[in-house]
Amino acid sequence: MKNKLAPYLLLAPQILLAILFVAGLIAGITQSFGVIPAFGLTEPTLRYYREIFLRPDLKESVLFSLKTAGLSALLATAGGVFFCGLCVMGGKTRGLSMRVIELPIIVPHAVTALFLISLLSKNGIAARILYSFGWIENQQQFPALIYDQNGAGIILGYLWKELPFMIYFVISLMANINRSLGEAAVNLGAAPWTAFFKITLPLCRNTILSGFLIIFVFALGAYELPMLLGATKPRALPVLAYQQYLHPDLRNRPYAMALNGIIIVISLLSAALYYALMNGQMRRLKLSGEKRRTSGRRGRSEKKGEGGGADG
């Protein structure tokens, strides 16, 4: 009896978290349509979405969020894969150095923001060092990396956090593939880097794309770094939603949920695109496998025919 219950007991925490997540999601979507009985709002309406889409700063905020999330995910993915390749080809995929590289993963985003402010602001450590060496005439000449309208500080913050995550996410699979198939290709005469780019890297593609999607969706919906490192204008979508959520008039709560609804839709579209890409790749692999099997059967039948003709 205990053995039968063990799997369900192990799944219980995950099921509980899933229920809480789904309940919160449903509540948020319901509130975005203006249904909050506690505040006297009982009639479903699209008014809040219409007013959100009529806001002059919405387009700017959407583009800013997509830019910071997309660049952060792209740079973290490219840098993580490049570093994984160097480690795998150098045979250094474990040990203390890897543990040190992965340390930023456990650092909260708020702490990351404070670290970057103390390091990269015009009154920060980097500006003081450059000024002390005489490379800048005063600290105000230091480049505006924090609170700038291009989101450079936000991107740097996500890059510092998510690049180690990408390394952690990919390196184990990449090392296992290279150790088995990559080394087999090298033994058959392929150059090490040729085997890596032709065999190891393509087989890691799905995992790399999954990591990119995770980073992109997270950076799109998180508000800590855009709130602490971003400029007053433009504001990222999560920051706009947070400001509406803290509005003194509680009847403004549906505006915050409508902004969150826009973030959810963008995330779902990204996931749908990823799913379509994966399905297309699987179909191509299936078709190529069927073609190889068909050509193999034809080759065997032709050989049998030649053998039969020779016997005749």
Predicted regions and their residues:
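Transmembrane alpha-helices
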Residues: L11-V22, L103, V107, W160-V170, ...
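Non-cytoplasmic
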Residues: G24-G34, M166-F169, T207-L240
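Transmembrane-helix boundary motif in ABC transporter permease subunits
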Residues: M1-K2, A27, L71-E102, L114-S118, ...
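C-terminal transmembrane helix and the adjacent membrane-cytosol boundary/short C-terminal tail
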Residues: G34, I171-G182, P254-E302, G307-D311
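Membrane-interfacial helix termini and adjacent extracytoplasmic/periplasmic loops
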Residues: L46, A113-L159, W193, L229-K233
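Interhelical loop and adjacent transmembrane-helix boundary motif
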Residues: K2-K4, Y49-D57, M227-A276
